[in-house]
């Protein structure tokens, strides 16, 4: 393993300039092995090493892990810094999940520490198995085509370079190294929780791939590196092409010439859309997957002016004659729509939320749409409206507030008021399409109701 890592560092010239390296250390096997390895080879690599531990304060073992890392550094004479990161408080404010919030806080703190101490590098313990997981997860989610690959070997953040020296080795090699140098790392039990997507990939898919080819991580590494190089080249071309079709650009509005855009090759068109979204979402786009880019492409090709598409976080794409506009909604609070609409029975009904199609069933449900539910004749007339304070859904046991349903499903605040609630004639909520159906509906097979949302953002949550 040692020579593999040294060869990887030399091949990618990770520490060519030398200087202080801040190693992100959780106390787990990956980061502890990286800390030990870099400190042991510091003279050969021409670097100085400092350990940085971010205490997320989420588990009882958190303080014990911080003490463990600190004591390890004291016993080896390694520089050490730590901080208590307010993950829970930030989650309550942002509504983001624990992993996303912890990662954002951790990296911001590491970057601040690097600036404070004049560090040239931040090193993390990501390894070859992590690379396989990341690439496969991106492919499954539909975000791989326009990404720059998997986990980058290096990434610039201001004046600091984030580097991953272990991307060329496996988790098994790291575990073996820990035993070899007598490191007994701490283990985070959440790494075994099947509720996290990455863990399901790690414990189910990675062993299968390893069984097929023990060196698969090397091939995935090349895939990521080649993809990054290819994508950088294509994005440069797309930037030049975008400059030629751009009519207006500021933080609230981007306008392009439709005809000029359509004269560009399709691969560059997709990347031009990607660049616009990246700009408007300030590099952190929730709308750069297959579904959003393809829907924007369809809108641009549509011959009907006035067509609109709603994206997450208040961005609207619209065709206005010969122009395509990306518009960011103002920060002003919009009135909550109520829109009570009655559905009497079979047929199609258009609402401000989208279209509802009701058909009578003869031989079981027909639609596979997640926005479909069934009901009986006694449920009609149905009423469709937006949420109101106090609305509740019925569960198998007890009830739940609709507001809590949206929180549990991680639906953004601005989208919640655009989501229809469907009531039966007894004023019970029979469906929040895509998120909830009344427990009794599975026994009611007289009619099938399919909702087609007008706002495509709803599809991101089902």
Curated annotation (Swiss-Prot):
Physiological role: Ligates lysine onto the cytidine present at position 34 of the AUA codon-specific tRNA(Ile) that contains the anticodon CAU, in an ATP-dependent manner. Cytidine is converted to lysidine, thus changing the amino acid specificity of the tRNA from methionine to isoleucine.
Family under the similarity heading: Belongs to the tRNA(Ile)-lysidine synthase family.
Entry comment, domain topic: The N-terminal region contains the highly conserved SGGXDS motif, predicted to be a P-loop motif involved in ATP binding.
GO cellular component: cytoplasm
EC number assigned by the record: 6.3.4.19
CDD domains on file: TilS_N
Keyword field contains rRNA-binding: no
Name of the top EC class for this enzyme: ligase
Residues reported in the UniProt entry to bind ATP: 26-31
Protein name per its UniProtKB record: tRNA(Ile)-lysidine synthase
Keywords for this protein: ATP-binding, Cytoplasm, Ligase, Nucleotide-binding, tRNA processing
Catalytic activity: cytidine(34) in tRNA(Ile2) + L-lysine + ATP = lysidine(34) in tRNA(Ile2) + AMP + diphosphate + H(+)
Disulfide bonds: none
Matches recorded under InterPro entries: Lysidine-tRNA-synth_C, Rossmann-like_a/b/a_fold, TilS/TtcA_N, tRNA_Ile_lys_synt, tRNA_Ile_lys_synt_N, tRNA_Ile_lys_synt_subst-bd
Keyword Ligase: yes
């Amino acid at each position: 393993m040692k020579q593999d890592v040294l060869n990887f560092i030399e091949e990618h010239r990770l520490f060519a300039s030398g200087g202080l390296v801040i190693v992100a250390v959780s106390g787990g096997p990956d980061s502890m092995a990286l800390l030990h390895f870099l400190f042991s080879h510091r003279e050969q690599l021409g670097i100085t090493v400092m350990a940085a531990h971010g205490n997320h304060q989420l588990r009882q073992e958190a303080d014990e892990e911080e003490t463990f890392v600190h004591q390890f550094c004291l016993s080896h004479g390694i520089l050490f810094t730590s901080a208590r990161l307010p993950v829970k408080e930030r989650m309550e404010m942002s509504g983001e999940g624990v992993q996303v919030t912890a990662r954002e806080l951790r990296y911001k703190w590491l970057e601040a520490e690097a600036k404070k101490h004049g560090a040239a590098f931040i090193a993390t313990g990501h390894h070859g198995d992590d690379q396989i997981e990341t690439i496969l997860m991106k492919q499954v989610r539909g975000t791989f085509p326009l990404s720059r690959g998997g986990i980058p070997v290096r990434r610039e953040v201001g004046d600091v370079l984030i580097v991953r020296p272990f991307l060329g080795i496996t988790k098994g090699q790291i575990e073996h190294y820990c035993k070899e140098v007598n490191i007994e790392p701490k283990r985070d039990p959440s790494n075994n929780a099947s509720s996290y997507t990455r863990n399901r990939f790690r414990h189910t898919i990675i062993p299968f791939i390893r069984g097929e080819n023990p060196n698969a991580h090397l091939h995935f590494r090349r895939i990521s590196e080649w993809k990054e190089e290819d994508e950088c080249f294509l994005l440069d071309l797309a930037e030049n092409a975008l400059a030629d079709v751009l009519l207006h650009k500021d933080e609230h509005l981007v306008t392009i010439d439709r005809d000029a855009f359509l004269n560009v090759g399709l691969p560059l068109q997709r990347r031009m859309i990607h660049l616009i979204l990246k700009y408007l979402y300030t590099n952190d786009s929730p709308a750069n997957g297959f579904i959003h880019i393809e829907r924007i492409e369809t809108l641009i090709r549509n011959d009907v002016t006035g067509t609109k598409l709603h994206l997450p976080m208040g961005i609207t794409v619209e065709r206005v004659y010969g122009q395509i506009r990306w518009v960011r909604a103002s920060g002003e609070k919009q009135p909550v729509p109520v829109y009570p609409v009655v559905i009497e029975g079979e047929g199609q009904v258009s609402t401000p939320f989208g279209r509802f199609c009701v058909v009578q069933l003869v031989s079981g449900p027909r639609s596979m749409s997640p926005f479909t539910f069934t009901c009986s004749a006694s449920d009609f007339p149905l009423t469709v409206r937006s949420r109101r304070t106090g609305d509740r859904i019925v569960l198998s046991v007890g009830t739940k507030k609709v507001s809590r349903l949206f929180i549990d499903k991680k639906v953004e605040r601005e989208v919640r008021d655009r989501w229809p609630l469907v009531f039966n004639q007894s004023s019970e909520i029979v469906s929040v399409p895509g998120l909830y159906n009344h427990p009794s509906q599975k026994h009611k097979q007289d009619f099938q109701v399919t909702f087609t949302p007008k706002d495509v953002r709803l599809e991101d949550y089902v």
